[in-house]
Amino acid sequence: MKSSFNLLINSGSARWIVQRIGGVVIFLYALFILWNLFVNESMSYFEWRQLFESKIVKFFSWVTVFSLISHAWIGMHCVISDYITVRLIGPKALVIRKIFMSTLTVILVVYFLWSALILWGL
């Protein structure tokens, strides 16, 4: 029997909430970047670098990257599970779907780790 935690994180409602929270985070980050562009019109490279060396901006950027990655994973999972089916493709659909999802997962994990390397210098 599955635990209630597994049922919660694998439910459509939980994915919907993650999508919406991620969308809000991405929106707030875009506002933050646009605000900095408009307020500091002649911002130099060194001022941008100084801004992004702030730990809070690094954290906000990393949370935004995580939001983008979770948003992409949930969206692509929905598309792949909707269109790569036995009814549409045939008996090999399950294998093809697993290959697509595994490849997507590897790519998104690499992106997340790469963002950590860029933002935190790890």
What do these predicted ranges mean?
Residues 1-122:
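Membrane-embedded alpha-helical bundles that constitute the cytochrome b-like, heme-associated redox core
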